C-alpha cells in the first residue's frame, strides 16, 4: 500500500490514521487500529472479571458458614459441608487456566432432609453470599423431551434469565433442584412402559450435571420451535439437589441390620438416631430408585435433621430476616409496635414442631395468629402497640380469637 493510501485510511473508531498507530486492520469498508483492539480487549476482560468475583475466593469456608449462620439456624454439619464444597468448587474454577496433571472434578451436592428443614434456604443463601446467578426448579415438573411438561433445558433458561442472559455468568452459577426424590424410578426392575417423569428425567439431568454444551431456547422450548438457541456449557455450573426421601430411613435400617452380623446395638443406635439420614450411602439411594450414574455425579451428600422446638423458637427471632422481624416491620409501617412474649414464641414453636412442617409451618401459624390484628389495626388511631402473649396464642388454638392491647 502506498504511503498516500495508508495515510488516507483511518481507524473507524478513534479516527487515527495509519502513521499514528502501529497497526491498522482492514475489514469490509471499515478499519480498526491496534490501540482500539487493546481497549476493547480490556473492556471485555474487565466485564468478565466482574462476573467472576468468586475467583478471588475472598470468603473462606469459615466465613461462608458465618454468613449462612446469619440466615439459617441449626443444621451445623450441613452448613459446614456446603461451605467446603462451594469453596472447593469455585477454587477449582479460579484455577482452570493453570496447567495441571490433576483434573479436579465438580462436587455437586445432595441435601436430604424433611420439609421445612432449610434445604432451599441454604441453597438460596449460598448464591446470595457468592454473588452468582441462582436458579431453582422442581424436579416433579420435569419430563423427558417430547412429553408434556418442562424440559431440563428450561432450568438452564432460568439460570440465563437470572444472569440477564450473560452466558459467562450463567456458566458459573448455581442451580438448585428440589424434590429430586420424586423422580426415582418406580421399581428396581426395568419397566416395559416408559417412565417419563422418573428414570427418563434422571437420564436427561445426567447429561447436564456431568457437563455438556446444551442448546437453550431463550423463549422456552416448545412454544417457539424455530427460535435460535443459546449454547451453554454446564461443566462449571454447581448443582445442588434436595429431597425429603420418605422411606429412605427404612432402607438404611435394613442395610445396617443385614450387615450388623448380630451386633444389635449398632442397629438400635441407627434406628433411634433422629438424623438417620446421616448414615446414607450411595447404595441406599440406588435402592431408593436413583440410577447409579446419577448418584455417581453427586459426590457430596449431607443430611438436614428435623427441627426441634428450641431450634424453631430460635428461627422465629434470630435470622437477619426472621419472621418476627418481618411482621414487626409490617406493623411498624402502620405506626404500631408489635411485641411477642417469650412464652408466646415457645407455644408457636411447639405447635410447629407437632405439625412436623418445619420452619415453613411457623409462617402459617403466625399468619393465622395475626390475621385479625392485621385486618383491624391499620387505621385505628387508638392502637399503637400490640403484645402477643402466651394466652393469646393458646386461645387461637381453640377459637382463633385475638384481642388488641391499647
Curated annotation (Swiss-Prot):
Residues 1-52 form the ClpX-type ZB domain. It comes from the Bacteria. InterPro entries: AAA+_ATPase (IPR003593), ATP-dep_Clp_protease_ClpX (IPR050052), ATPase_AAA_core (IPR003959), Clp_ATPase_C (IPR019489), Clp_protease_ATP-bd_su_ClpX (IPR004487), ClpX_bact (IPR046425), P-loop_NTPase (IPR027417), Znf_CppX_C4 (IPR010603). Keywords: ATP-binding, Chaperone, Metal-binding, Nucleotide-binding, Zinc. One of its GO terms (cellular component) is HslUV protease complex. PROSITE patterns: CLPX_ZB. ATP binds at residues 114-121. Zn(2+) binds at residues 11, 14, 33, 36. One of its GO terms (molecular function) is ATP-dependent protein folding chaperone. It holds the Pfam family ClpB_D2-small. GO terms for biological process: cell division; proteolysis involved in protein catabolic process. The keyword Cell wall biogenesis/degradation does not apply. HAMAP family: ClpX. ATP-dependent specificity component of the Clp protease. It directs the protease to specific substrates. Can perform chaperone functions in the absence of ClpP. Component of the ClpX-ClpP complex. Forms a hexameric ring that, in the presence of ATP, binds to fourteen ClpP subunits assembled into a disk-like structure with a central cavity, resembling the structure of eukaryotic proteasomes. Belongs to the ClpX chaperone family. This is ATP-dependent Clp protease ATP-binding subunit ClpX. The gene is clpX.
